[in-house]
Amino acid sequence: MELRKIFDTIPEQFDRFRPRYSPELFQYLIDHAGIAPGKTVLEIGPGTGQATDPILETGCDYHAIELGEHLYAKMKEKYGAFTNFHIVNDDFITHDFALQRFDMIYSAATIQWIPEQVAFAKTFELLKPGGILAMMLTRSDYKTPNEDLYAKIQKLYDQYYKPEIPYAQGGFRYDHAPEYGYVDFQQHHFPGRREMNPDEYVSYCGTHCDHIVIPEPYKTAFFEGLRKVVAENGGKVVFEDTHVLYLTRKPDDR
Protein backbone atom coordinates (compact mmCIF):
# COMPACT_ATOMS: atom_id res chain seq x y z
CA MET A 1 0.00 0.00 0.00
CA GLU A 2 1.19 3.52 -0.79
CA LEU A 3 2.05 5.59 2.28
CA ARG A 4 -0.38 8.30 1.18
CA LYS A 5 -3.20 5.75 1.54
CA ILE A 6 -2.16 4.47 4.97
CA PHE A 7 -4.14 7.13 6.86
CA ASP A 8 -7.35 5.62 5.51
CA THR A 9 -6.81 2.55 7.71
CA ILE A 10 -7.30 4.57 10.95
CA PRO A 11 -10.13 7.08 10.35
CA GLU A 12 -11.37 7.27 13.96
CA GLN A 13 -7.90 7.60 15.52
CA PHE A 14 -6.92 10.08 12.82
CA ASP A 15 -9.97 12.21 13.60
CA ARG A 16 -9.31 12.27 17.35
CA PHE A 17 -5.58 12.80 17.49
CA ARG A 18 -4.36 14.69 14.43
CA PRO A 19 -3.64 18.31 15.36
CA ARG A 20 -5.77 21.23 14.22
CA TYR A 21 -4.46 24.56 12.97
CA SER A 22 -4.51 27.86 14.82
CA PRO A 23 -7.66 30.03 14.70
CA GLU A 24 -5.42 32.99 13.86
CA LEU A 25 -4.18 31.23 10.73
CA PHE A 26 -7.71 30.64 9.51
CA GLN A 27 -8.85 34.16 10.26
CA TYR A 28 -5.90 35.53 8.30
CA LEU A 29 -6.65 33.18 5.40
CA ILE A 30 -10.37 33.96 5.32
CA ASP A 31 -9.73 37.70 5.39
CA HIS A 32 -6.94 37.51 2.80
CA ALA A 33 -8.97 35.43 0.33
CA GLY A 34 -12.32 37.06 1.09
CA ILE A 35 -14.00 33.73 1.77
CA ALA A 36 -17.73 34.22 2.34
CA PRO A 37 -21.09 33.09 0.94
CA GLY A 38 -20.90 33.13 -2.83
CA LYS A 39 -17.24 32.05 -2.95
CA THR A 40 -16.35 28.57 -4.19
CA VAL A 41 -13.58 26.71 -2.35
CA LEU A 42 -11.85 23.35 -2.90
CA GLU A 43 -9.99 21.50 -0.14
CA ILE A 44 -7.54 18.85 -1.35
CA GLY A 45 -7.32 15.85 0.98
CA PRO A 46 -9.30 16.99 4.02
CA GLY A 47 -8.66 13.79 5.97
CA THR A 48 -11.37 13.94 8.61
CA GLY A 49 -11.69 17.72 8.69
CA GLN A 50 -8.61 18.99 10.52
CA ALA A 51 -8.79 22.19 8.44
CA THR A 52 -12.42 22.10 7.34
CA ASP A 53 -14.64 23.74 9.97
CA PRO A 54 -13.44 27.36 9.78
CA ILE A 55 -13.80 27.44 5.98
CA LEU A 56 -17.09 25.55 5.82
CA GLU A 57 -18.59 27.78 8.51
CA THR A 58 -18.05 30.91 6.39
CA GLY A 59 -21.01 29.77 4.31
CA CYS A 60 -18.90 29.44 1.17
CA ASP A 61 -19.63 26.78 -1.44
CA TYR A 62 -17.24 24.19 0.01
CA HIS A 63 -15.95 21.29 -2.09
CA ALA A 64 -13.43 18.60 -1.12
CA ILE A 65 -11.72 15.69 -2.79
CA GLU A 66 -10.54 12.85 -0.54
CA LEU A 67 -8.57 9.80 -1.68
CA GLY A 68 -9.37 7.50 1.26
CA GLU A 69 -12.78 5.86 1.24
CA HIS A 70 -12.97 5.63 5.04
CA LEU A 71 -11.80 9.21 5.52
CA TYR A 72 -14.37 10.24 2.92
CA ALA A 73 -17.08 8.41 4.87
CA LYS A 74 -16.02 10.16 8.08
CA MET A 75 -16.23 13.54 6.34
CA LYS A 76 -19.74 12.70 5.12
CA GLU A 77 -20.71 11.65 8.64
CA LYS A 78 -19.41 14.87 10.20
CA TYR A 79 -20.43 17.45 7.62
CA GLY A 80 -23.11 15.90 5.43
CA ALA A 81 -25.84 17.99 7.06
CA PHE A 82 -24.29 21.25 5.81
CA THR A 83 -26.05 22.37 2.65
CA ASN A 84 -22.87 24.04 1.38
CA PHE A 85 -20.78 20.86 1.79
CA HIS A 86 -19.77 18.76 -1.22
CA ILE A 87 -17.18 15.99 -1.38
CA VAL A 88 -15.98 13.37 -3.85
CA ASN A 89 -14.00 10.21 -3.14
CA ASP A 90 -11.26 10.24 -5.77
CA ASP A 91 -7.61 10.96 -6.50
CA PHE A 92 -6.90 14.64 -7.18
CA ILE A 93 -4.15 13.64 -9.60
CA THR A 94 -6.55 11.89 -11.99
CA HIS A 95 -9.95 13.40 -11.16
CA ASP A 96 -11.77 15.22 -13.96
CA PHE A 97 -13.18 18.46 -12.54
CA ALA A 98 -14.77 19.28 -15.92
CA LEU A 99 -15.73 22.97 -15.93
CA GLN A 100 -15.51 23.51 -12.15
CA ARG A 101 -13.43 26.52 -11.14
CA PHE A 102 -12.67 27.83 -7.66
CA ASP A 103 -12.00 31.13 -5.90
CA MET A 104 -9.63 29.36 -3.49
CA ILE A 105 -7.96 25.96 -3.36
CA TYR A 106 -6.32 24.92 -0.11
CA SER A 107 -4.52 21.95 1.35
CA ALA A 108 -3.41 21.16 4.88
CA ALA A 109 -0.25 19.03 4.49
CA THR A 110 -1.81 16.93 1.72
CA ILE A 111 -0.40 18.67 -1.33
CA GLN A 112 3.09 17.37 -0.46
CA TRP A 113 1.88 13.89 -1.51
CA ILE A 114 1.17 15.12 -5.05
CA PRO A 115 4.02 15.51 -7.56
CA GLU A 116 4.95 19.18 -7.65
CA GLN A 117 4.31 19.64 -11.36
CA VAL A 118 0.82 18.14 -11.08
CA ALA A 119 -0.01 20.00 -7.87
CA PHE A 120 0.84 23.46 -9.14
CA ALA A 121 -0.22 23.05 -12.77
CA LYS A 122 -3.59 21.50 -11.96
CA THR A 123 -4.49 23.90 -9.16
CA PHE A 124 -3.52 26.80 -11.43
CA GLU A 125 -5.89 25.48 -14.10
CA LEU A 126 -8.72 24.99 -11.59
CA LEU A 127 -8.53 28.47 -10.07
CA LYS A 128 -10.51 31.39 -11.37
CA PRO A 129 -8.45 34.43 -12.43
CA GLY A 130 -7.13 36.03 -9.24
CA GLY A 131 -7.87 32.87 -7.25
CA ILE A 132 -5.86 31.94 -4.16
CA LEU A 133 -3.83 28.79 -3.52
CA ALA A 134 -3.26 28.25 0.22
CA MET A 135 -1.04 25.52 1.64
CA MET A 136 -0.49 24.88 5.33
CA LEU A 137 1.53 22.59 7.56
CA THR A 138 2.65 22.33 11.17
CA ARG A 139 6.27 22.22 12.30
CA SER A 140 6.52 20.79 15.80
CA ASP A 141 9.37 21.10 18.28
CA TYR A 142 9.18 18.76 21.25
CA LYS A 143 12.92 18.69 21.88
CA THR A 144 13.28 22.19 23.33
CA PRO A 145 10.47 21.90 25.93
CA ASN A 146 11.39 18.30 26.95
CA GLU A 147 15.14 17.83 26.41
CA ASP A 148 15.70 14.91 28.80
CA LEU A 149 12.51 13.15 27.73
CA TYR A 150 13.35 13.77 24.08
CA ALA A 151 16.70 12.00 24.47
CA LYS A 152 14.99 8.96 26.01
CA ILE A 153 12.38 8.89 23.25
CA GLN A 154 15.14 8.93 20.63
CA LYS A 155 16.63 5.79 22.16
CA LEU A 156 13.31 4.03 21.55
CA TYR A 157 13.39 5.19 17.94
CA ASP A 158 16.90 3.84 17.57
CA GLN A 159 15.80 0.47 18.93
CA TYR A 160 12.33 -0.08 17.46
CA TYR A 161 11.64 2.35 14.62
CA LYS A 162 11.83 -0.03 11.65
CA PRO A 163 8.99 0.87 9.24
CA GLU A 164 8.27 -1.54 6.40
CA ILE A 165 7.78 1.41 4.02
CA PRO A 166 10.34 4.22 4.47
CA TYR A 167 9.03 7.79 4.67
CA ALA A 168 10.47 9.64 1.69
CA GLN A 169 8.41 12.83 1.65
CA GLY A 170 9.81 16.27 2.32
CA GLY A 171 10.99 17.21 -1.15
CA PHE A 172 7.93 19.27 -2.07
CA ARG A 173 8.96 22.91 -2.56
CA TYR A 174 6.11 25.25 -1.74
CA ASP A 175 8.16 28.21 -2.93
CA HIS A 176 8.29 26.77 -6.45
CA ALA A 177 4.72 28.00 -7.09
CA PRO A 178 5.90 31.07 -9.09
CA GLU A 179 7.62 28.72 -11.56
CA TYR A 180 4.14 27.56 -12.60
CA GLY A 181 2.64 31.00 -13.17
CA TYR A 182 1.62 31.94 -9.64
CA VAL A 183 2.35 35.43 -8.27
CA ASP A 184 2.53 37.15 -4.86
CA PHE A 185 4.00 34.17 -2.99
CA GLN A 186 3.86 34.71 0.79
CA GLN A 187 4.74 32.77 3.95
CA HIS A 188 3.22 33.40 7.38
CA HIS A 189 3.87 31.77 10.76
CA PHE A 190 1.42 31.31 13.63
CA PRO A 191 2.52 29.89 17.02
CA GLY A 192 0.76 27.11 18.88
CA ARG A 193 1.26 24.82 21.86
CA ARG A 194 0.04 21.34 22.74
CA GLU A 195 0.37 19.11 25.80
CA MET A 196 -0.26 15.36 25.72
CA ASN A 197 -0.45 12.74 28.44
CA PRO A 198 1.15 9.33 27.79
CA ASP A 199 -1.92 7.77 26.17
CA GLU A 200 -2.60 10.82 24.00
CA TYR A 201 1.01 10.95 22.87
CA VAL A 202 1.04 7.28 21.88
CA SER A 203 -2.27 7.65 20.02
CA TYR A 204 -0.94 10.72 18.23
CA CYS A 205 2.27 8.93 17.22
CA GLY A 206 0.07 6.13 15.93
CA THR A 207 -1.35 8.49 13.31
CA HIS A 208 2.01 9.04 11.60
CA CYS A 209 2.03 7.12 8.33
CA ASP A 210 5.51 5.67 8.86
CA HIS A 211 4.67 4.63 12.43
CA ILE A 212 1.56 2.77 11.27
CA VAL A 213 3.72 0.48 9.13
CA ILE A 214 6.18 -0.55 11.84
CA PRO A 215 5.86 -4.37 11.93
CA GLU A 216 5.61 -6.58 14.97
CA PRO A 217 7.30 -7.31 17.28
CA TYR A 218 8.79 -3.81 17.08
CA LYS A 219 5.49 -1.92 16.94
CA THR A 220 4.07 -3.02 20.29
CA ALA A 221 7.42 -2.64 22.05
CA PHE A 222 7.85 0.82 20.52
CA PHE A 223 4.47 2.19 21.57
CA GLU A 224 4.58 0.58 25.01
CA GLY A 225 8.04 2.07 25.46
CA LEU A 226 6.80 5.53 24.49
CA ARG A 227 3.93 5.33 26.95
CA LYS A 228 6.20 4.16 29.77
CA VAL A 229 8.95 6.74 29.23
CA VAL A 230 6.49 9.65 29.15
CA ALA A 231 4.69 8.38 32.26
CA GLU A 232 8.00 8.12 34.12
CA ASN A 233 9.24 11.58 33.06
CA GLY A 234 6.66 14.12 34.09
CA GLY A 235 3.62 12.47 32.56
CA LYS A 236 3.32 14.82 29.58
CA VAL A 237 4.90 15.84 26.29
CA VAL A 238 4.86 19.51 25.30
CA PHE A 239 4.88 20.56 21.65
CA GLU A 240 5.82 24.07 20.58
CA ASP A 241 4.15 24.32 17.19
CA THR A 242 4.61 26.66 14.28
CA HIS A 243 1.66 26.65 11.89
CA VAL A 244 2.95 27.68 8.47
CA LEU A 245 0.68 29.22 5.85
CA TYR A 246 1.87 29.58 2.27
CA LEU A 247 -0.21 31.83 0.02
CA THR A 248 0.03 32.52 -3.68
CA ARG A 249 -2.30 33.77 -6.38
CA LYS A 250 -3.26 33.14 -9.98
CA PRO A 251 -2.88 36.40 -11.94
CA ASP A 252 -6.07 38.31 -12.68
CA ASP A 253 -5.49 38.11 -16.42
CA ARG A 254 -4.95 34.34 -16.69
Where are these regions (language model features)?
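Conserved class I S-adenosyl-L-methionine
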Residues: 1-36
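Nucleotide donor/acceptor-binding cores
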Residues: 38-39, 100
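Class I SAM-dependent methyltransferase SAM/SAH-binding core
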Residues: 40-42, 48-95
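Conserved Class I S-adenosyl-L-methionine
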Residues: 48, 165-166, 170-254
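A short acidic, Gly/Pro-enriched loop at the edge of an enzyme's catalytic core
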Residues: 95-105
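Short catalytic micro-motifs in class I SAM-dependent methyltransferases
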Residues: 109-110, 137
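A short, conserved alpha-helix within the catalytic core of class I
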Residues: 113-123
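Conserved catalytic/acceptor-binding region of the Class I
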Residues: 121-124, 128-193
